């Protein structure tokens, strides 16, 4: 898909056009989780041990996207891309804990201009940006989300349609210590190291996901009670989980996310689509649903036709970027993915990849890392996983049809050289179009020195 890119200097009125309202605009419920991997819900993985009965029930009423992706696998740039419809290099929110340039309109304001009351709960934007978004109502409490939404609905003046943006902190670390799963029974993915400590932490992580499921179920029932069939519900996550090769990485474990949409009377129930969509497309789609159009100045586009079953095709390519997270993750990466292949560019492979998990090793987060180091001393397979985690080649290429977990790098395989060159050139052209400066935002950890954990917190 070829898109036009240009600087956005016009106001919101020039950004959004065609504000004609439908006779009965649907209320909107957008439920966002934090660090939830797509493989860790039975919506996508029948072999997972995670129980999500509510999400499975809700999915029978709507459409599940098999190939939904985010713009960047860290909270701040991912959520900035969601709210602006722009990729990180354009918004200025590239590294984690950074914010978009205020000259770029936030797309939920288009809902407000169209008569919607926009209420946000929990973590919708990142950090202090929640207070600067101009929501009509904001409650920052992370606990009791359904109770907070109910109280808001009870006290608001009826009349205007409402958009409820609900941000659940789970399953972001620290994970819960109230276990719903027995660690001894946990099956560990092959790309992680199977230790007692890994299983204990997976049990915590899984328990948080089931907690999310319970909350989503309550929110869904509340929407049905208050809105009848006149609502559209979106469920998704800002990126993959805080595990090695997931969050802060451009493997599918980091960039591919659950996406479920329910829209009674418009979306065929119990359906799935292979259309590739990005988080930058979500708000353009919602604006389209309520009767508005978004200009071509955005990177995002409406996939309303996919929702309505008119097409099963959308994006030909998904571009993703990662630019780092403070002093503990200084490893910029870029990638392009199509329906079958992925090309990854590690911009500075002379440095170690690292992040908060392996450096801090906090309880209920990354404390399993000590057991990994111990296992690697006697187990060559464990040592290979750790080496792959820390040291990356300049380029990676995967055939996702035969290697969906991206374990075999085919960058030097003669059979794929034509496809590799095509995707290499495609990514380079897109980066230039975006104005990507390939910046290092902190001092990296050179592989000529000790591993980051050995240096401690800088």
Which residue stretches match the model-derived regions?
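Formylglycine-dependent sulfatase
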Residues: 2-4, 19-396, 404-425, 429-432, ...
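Hydrophobic h-region of N-terminal signal peptides that target proteins for export
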Residues: 10-19
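C-terminal helical cap and adjacent loop that interface with cofactors, partners, or active-site loops
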Residues: 401
């Amino acid at each position: 898909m070829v898109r036009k890119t240009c600087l956005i200097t016009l106001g919101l009125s020039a950004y959004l056009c065609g504000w004609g309202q439908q006779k009965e605009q649907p209320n909107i419920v957008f439920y966002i989780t934090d660090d939830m991997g797509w493989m860790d819900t039975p919506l996508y993985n029948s072999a997972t041990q995670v129980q999500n009965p509510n999400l499975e029930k809700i999915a029978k009423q709507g459409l599940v996207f098999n190939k939904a992706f985010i713009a960047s696998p860290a909270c701040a740039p991912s959520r900035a891309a969601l709210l602006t419809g722009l990729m990180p290099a354009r918004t200025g929110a590239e590294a984690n804990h950074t914010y978009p340039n205020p000259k770029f309109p936030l797309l939920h304001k288009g809902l407000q201009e169209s008569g919607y009351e926009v209420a946000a709960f929990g973590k919708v934007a990142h950090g202090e940006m929640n207070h600067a978004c101009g929501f009509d109502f904001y409650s920052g409490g992370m606990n009791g989300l359904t109770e907070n939404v109910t109280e808001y609905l009870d006290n608001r003046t009826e009349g205007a349609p409402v958009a409820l943006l609900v941000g659940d902190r789970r399953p972001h670390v620290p994970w819960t210590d109230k276990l719903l799963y027995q660690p001894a029974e946990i099956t560990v993915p092959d790309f992680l190291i199977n230790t007692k400590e890994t299983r204990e932490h997976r049990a915590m992580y899984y328990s948080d996901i089931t907690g999310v499921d319970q909350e989503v179920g309550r929110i869904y029932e509340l929407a049905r009670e208050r809105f009848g069939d006149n609502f559209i519900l979106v469920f998704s996550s800002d990126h993959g989980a805080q595990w090695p090769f997931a969050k802060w990485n451009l493997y599918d474990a980091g960039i591919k996310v659950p996406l479920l949409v329910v829209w009674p009377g418009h979306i065929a129930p119990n359906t799935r689509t292979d259309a590739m969509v990005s988080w930058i497309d979500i708000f353009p789609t919602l604006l389209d649903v309520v009767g508005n159009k978004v200009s071509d100045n955005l990177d995002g586009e409406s996939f309303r036709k996919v929702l309505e079953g008119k097409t099963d095709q959308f994006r030909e390519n998904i571009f993703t970027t990662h630019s780092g997270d403070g002093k503990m993750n200084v490893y910029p990466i870029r990638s392009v993915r199509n329906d079958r292949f992925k090309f990854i560019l590690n911009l500075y492979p002379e440095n170690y990849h690292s992040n908060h998990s392996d450096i801090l090793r906090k309880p209920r987060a990354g404390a399993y890392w000590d057991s990994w180091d111990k296992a690697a001393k006697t187990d060559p397979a464990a040592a290979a996983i750790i080496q792959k985690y820390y040291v990356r080649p300049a380029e990676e290429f995967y055939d996702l049809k035969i290697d969906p977990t991206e374990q075999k790098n085919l960058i030097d395989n003669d059979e794929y050289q034509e496809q590799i060159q095509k995707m290499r050139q495609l990514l380079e052209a897109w980066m230039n179009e975006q104005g990507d400066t390939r910046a290092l935002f902190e001092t990296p950890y050179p592989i000529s020195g000790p591993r980051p954990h050995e240096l401690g917190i800088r």
